[in-house]
Curated annotation (Swiss-Prot):
Its EC number is 3.1.13.1. This is DIS3-like exonuclease 1. Keywords: Cytoplasm, Exonuclease, Exosome, Hydrolase, Magnesium, Nuclease, RNA-binding. It comes from Xenopus tropicalis (Western clawed frog). CDD domains: PIN_Rrp44-like (cd09862). It is found in: Cytoplasm. PROSITE patterns: RIBONUCLEASE_II (PS01175). PANTHER family: DIS3-LIKE EXONUCLEASE 1, RIBONUCLEASE. Residues 458-807 form the RNB domain. Its cofactor is Mg(2+). It catalyses: Exonucleolytic cleavage in the 3'- to 5'-direction to yield nucleoside 5'-phosphates. GO terms for cellular component: cytoplasmic exosome (RNase complex).
Length: 1039
């Protein structure tokens, strides 16, 4: 043990305080090397097949952590000394990032507690600087580590300090001290991305040092210190919340939604407007900020006018009501991430020096300001999407400083645009690693998978129950199956059987860690990125017909007439599904149509077996009755039926799209959805009963009443009244808001109700009161996700909780409340990212479809539209043919208004607009008036507004104030999914052909073994109903 004493003089003539510091040293500190024969081999170990170990010093770890995050860099030893320097000098954000890297088993790096090892640690000498001591201590630890491993493997210490290299490089044989650049060039010559990132970061650090020396005048006020911000929030002087920038007016409008964490009550009941970039004070979209309210005389209103772009200041809403307005005084937590950007044109590039260029790149996301980076590749990458990161934003700079990371691809290329969407949503879709795939079981003709004898304690349903599944056509990822039978007592027994994913994915394995990181399967318009390897998601965890499978089941015994539940059983089972039915086939059987017996191969034997046929028909019919009764109970409690559009993508070979299959509403859809909701509800009750402080549930809070305002106004225009005081009142009033002459009215009202909904989210029960558990949309007191463990990590956690609750699984690996709440936050973020990714990919395909078409001559660019919103200078439209929502201007940039002739044709001419609650009136100079009313049908022309920097966008132009009547050779207006299928199919085929012609077929990367283990491309109707609370229809409007 080392013991040091210091005498601290608190005041010049005050008393002295003696401080004693004890430092304990041990011989048995675990080294973490797989080559070591003496230390324990538990926990994370460095790989055995390494050629060397690399040890970064403090400065490398602080400045180049991003480079060390490359998974290709292996054998990294992080010394405790360097780790603590990051914590003390780089703050909590980077320290947490380092800790995540050390915990991640996918990265070959460990933490060595060198300051507790007796021979590795060196005490600081009198008068020695902290940096010199840290370097000396880390080098001594490298020497000890080399000798501890019996000199089997060399150790390389990397540093940027040339004096350190001169001092230590030749001191110990096989312990090398080199610069980071030399290390990357020598040991990893093929890892070009790491070297480029290193050079970019180095140049950024150099530029930052130059700026600090120059000391330019301040462009923004300094942020207040954290202790002042916290005190101000507690006293009520400042408010805290997350900054949300309006993407349509990114230079003008940002809003801070209060989190209600202040110490005193506030009468602010709405968002706080941050008007302009100066009051935003270097805060970026997503940052947690502290805001000071301005005086009421300085408050402004939210602009409700349509605008041409994010900097259009001419579009002003004179009727806007003022709202609380403030300015940012400090940043509580940054939300910086990777950003996709594009270089400006050559003539706009500012060159500084001979070897580097300081360039303002334009982010893909409108809400992010320009970022200044230093790079030598600006001209070479003119037409490419690149990834950049923000490093700092000093008060002396108009723009944040960042660095170049990597190239995604050429602008406009389909794969590059898809990669852009993934990066913008922080989605990583690397192939599953060898370590993860090595954990997978085998199921080949040579080595078929079989039920293990040790699984004999499972309830075997293979000979006692008629089990069947009902899924979309072609579905191969069957994660749920059903059974229903009559018991000798006269009661009914209903079973929901879910794939037992947790049997194949134990906690903290490589596969489990990867699934936790992804959190969900990501669905794009033309592809899917799985949460689990295909051998599980499409084979061994898929409840296919005629094969044995492990399941986790919920089985109810219920009254045969009232369907009241008498008792319930939970546990692990073995099942063999007898039939794999599609929704359409099940619907035909329920309706008494036996044609599937001739068309479906697996149903052919039933023609000769009337007994088994009768059993199946009875089961399908009875299942529908039970589901209907269950739904009626939820309806009486206020369950909502909202509106959405669902499409299932069918992929063919070479990553092309064959079709998008429309999902026609069937009674069987509701039947299966209701059975899954019932299972989720009962599992939620069970796990909360057993683990009230750390059960994973899903809540859906009521929407804020102001969000329903536009819905109420639209309904009022057609004579309907929408009551939003409760979910029951909302559901009843939506049911009554039917216009027999136009069914789209009710559809649009339900879509608007969907958009007004709050986000459903996962949570740990120990962090909320029981009153907050309620699921507003489903009208259930407790709810969770249990039925889709193949594609949702939350379901895997719930399976582990349930199995532990019924003593069929281990209890020692369950997460406590704090860890579970942190996991829930991660899953919620990933789910939102998945939804945004899906919407943005749909936007991409819509734009690519219309981009090469002449809007003046191509009839596919002409569509019927319905007005569902009124703005100061235009209207909001819904196109049922394509499922698109967008804006159309009634006043252009020249001040002309859109007037109509007697034949309905529209043209621009001088005039004025008057906005009323249910219409907008156009008055020309000739005193002629025309009205555009809510729910009016008009004819629009669709064209694409291209952008070099940002995503392309759909633009709508009203050409007639009457419905579009020419429907020849066009898809049915009542079937927008069919039109979307043609849209995505054509865009993908065009993109693939162009890519083959320009870049060669090697650029295409079809998923291996896709046909062997194909997973369904879309989500079931049940999944859609589950997620409608979070996801509204795509909005491409400028509103």
């Amino acid at each position: 043990m080392l013991k040091t004493e210091k005498i601290l003089h608190l005041k010049a003539r005050g008393r002295s305080v003696r401080a004693v510091r004890e430092h304990y040293l041990r011989e048995d500190v675990r080294c973490g090397s797989a080559l070591c024969l003496t230390c324990p081999r538990d926990g994370k170990l460095l790989s055995e097949d390494l050629t060397h170990y690399v040890v970064p010093d403090c400065q490398i770890l602080q400045d180049y952590l991003e480079v060390l995050e490359f998974p290709e860099l292996r054998g990294i030893i992080i010394m405790q000394t360097a780790c603590q320097s990051v914590q003390h000098q780089r703050g909590r954000r980077q320290y947490k990032r380092l800790c995540s890297l050390l915990r991640d088993t996918r990265h070959d790096c460990i933490l060595f507690s060198n300051e507790f090892q007796n021979h590795a640690y060196l005490p600081r000498e009198m008068g020695e600087s902290a940096l010199a001591w840290q370097t000396r201590c880390i080098y001594n630890s490298c020497v000890w580590y080399y000798q501890h491993c019996q000199k089997k493997i060399p150790v390389v210490m990397v540093t940027e300090d040339k004096s350190v290299i001169r001092q230590y490089n030749t001191e110990t044989q096989e312990v090398y001290v080199v610069s980071f650049q030399i290390y990357l060039e020598t040991f990893w010559p093929n890892l070009k991305g790491a070297l480029e990132l290193y050079k970019s970061l180095k140049e950024t650090h150099r530029e930052r040092e130059l700026e600090s020396r120059e000391g330019n005048g301040k462009e923004y006020p300094e942020h207040l210190p954290l202790e002042i911000l916290e005190a101000g929030i507690k006293s009520g002087r400042y408010q805290q919340g997350v900054l949300s920038v309006n993407k349509h007016r990114a230079q003008l409008e940002g809003f801070v939604r209060l989190q209600g964490l202040g110490g005193k009550e506030t009468d602010i009941q709405s968002d706080i407007l941050i008007y302009g970039t100066k009051p935003r004070n270097r805060a970026i979209h997503g940052d947690l900020v502290a805001v000071e309210l301005l005086s009421r005389s300085e408050w402004k209103g939210r602009n409700g006018a349509l605008c041409e772009n994010e900097t259009d200041e001419k579009a002003v809403d004179a009727q806007a009501e003022v709202m609380p307005t403030g300015r940012v005084v400090g940043i509580l937590q940054r939300n910086w991430r990777d950003y996709v950007a594009t270089f400006p044109a050559k003539e706009d590039i500012e060159t500084q020096g001979k070897n580097a260029q300081r360039v303002l790149v334009m982010p893909w996301d409108y809400r992010i300001p320009k970022i200044r980076i230093s790079t030598q590749q600006a001209e070479a990458l003119q037409d490419y999407r690149v990834v950049v990161r923000i490093d700092s934003w000093e008060s002396t700079s108009l723009y944040p400083n960042g660095h170049f990371v990597r190239v995604l691809g050429r602008t406009g290329n389909l794969e590059a645009e898809i990669a852009t969407i993934l990066v913008e949503n922080s989605i990583s879709v690397n192939p599953f690693s060898e370590a993860q795939l090595a954990e997978m079981p085998s199921n080949t003709p040579e080595s078929p998978w079989q039920v293990k004898p040790e699984e004999g304690d499972r309830l075997d349903l293979r000979k006692t129950h008629l089990v069947f599944s009902i899924d979309p056509k072609g579905c191969e990822d069957v994660d749920d199956a059903l059974s229903i039978r009559k018991l000798p007592s006269g009661h009914l027994e209903l079973g929901v059987h879910i794939a037992d994913v947790t049997h194949f994915v134990p906690p903290n394995t490589y596969t489990d860690i990867e699934a936790r990181s992804r959190a969900t399967t990501y669905y794009l318009a033309d592809r899917r990125y799985d949460m689990l390897p295909l051998i599980l998601s499409a084979d061994l965890c898929s409840l296919l017909g005629g094969v044995d499978r492990y399941a986790v089941s919920v089985i109810w015994e219920m009254d045969s007439s009232t369907y009241e539940i008498r008792r319930v059983w939970y546990g692990r089972t073995i099942i063999r599904s007898s039939y794999k039915l599609s929704y359409e086939v099940a619907q035909q059987l329920m309706d008494g149509d036996l044609e599937p017996l001739n068309t479906e191969m697996e149903l052919h034997p039933l023609k000769q077996d009337p007994v088994r046929l009768e059993q199946l028909l009875w089961a399908v019919g009875k299942l529908t009755e039970v589901a209907h009764a269950t739904r009626m109970r939820r309806d009486m409690s206020g369950a909502l039926e909202l509106e959405g559009v669902e499409v299932r993508v069918q992929l063919g070979e070479k990553h092309s799209i064959d079709d998008l299959v429309p999902k026609q509403p069937l009674q069987m859809h509701e039947t299966i959805a209701e059975c899954m909701i019932l299972a989720n509800h009962w599992v939620a009750k069970k796990i909360w009963e057993c683990y009230p402080q750390h059960a994973l549930l899903r809540l859906h809070p009521p929407a804020r009443q102001e969000f329903f305002q536009e819905l109420k106004e639209c309904a009022k225009a057609r004579g309907f009244s929408i009551d939003t005081r409760s979910n029951k009142a909302l559901a009843d009033s939506l049911d009554q808001a039917n216009d027999p002459s136009d069914p789209l009215v009710n559809q649009l009202l339900r879509m608007m109700a969907t958009q007004a909904m709050s986000n459903a989210r996962y949570f740990s029960t120990g962090s909320y009161t029981e009153d907050e558990f309620y699921h507003y949309g489903l009208a259930l007191e407790k709810y969770t996700h249990f039925t889709s463990p193949i594609r949702r990590y939350a379901d895997i956690v719930v399976h582990r909780l349930l199995l532990a609750a019924v003593n069929k699984g281990p209890k020692d690996n369950l997460l406590g409340n704090k860890d579970l709440e942190e996991l829930c936050r991660h899953i919620n973020v990933r789910n939102r990212a998945a939804q945004h990714c899906q919407k943005q990919s749909t936007e991409l395909f819509q734009c690519m479809f219309f981009k090469d078409k002449d809007p003046d001559s191509d009839q596919r660019c002409i569509s019927d539209a319905v007005i569902y919103g009124i703005r100061t200078n235009g209207v909001l439209l819904f196109l049922p043919r394509y499922g698109i929502k967008g804006a159309a201007y009634l006043k252009n940039i020249d001040g002309l208004v859109l007037a109509c002739k007697d034949n309905g044709r529209c043209h621009w001419m001088p005039g004025s607009l008057q906005r009323l609650p249910d219409r907008i009136v156009v008055t020309t100079q000739e005193a002629k008036s025309f009205s555009y009313c809510l729910f009016d049908h008009v004819t629009v022309r669709i064209h694409v507004q291209s952008s070099r920097f940002h995503p392309d966008s759909i633009r709508l132009e009203i050409i007639r104030n009457r419905p579009h009547s020419s429907q020849e050779a066009l898809p049915s207006a009542s079937n927008p999914q069919l039109a979307r299928s043609e849209l995505v199919k054509e865009v993908t085929r065009t993109a693939v052909e162009a890519q083959l012609a320009v870049e060669g077929a090697e650029e295409l990367k079809p998923v291996e073994h896709y046909q062997e283990y194909r997973q369904t491309q879309g989500q079931s109707l049940y999944s859609m109903l589950e997620e409608l609370w979070d996801l509204a229809l795509l909005d491409v409007s400028g509103a």
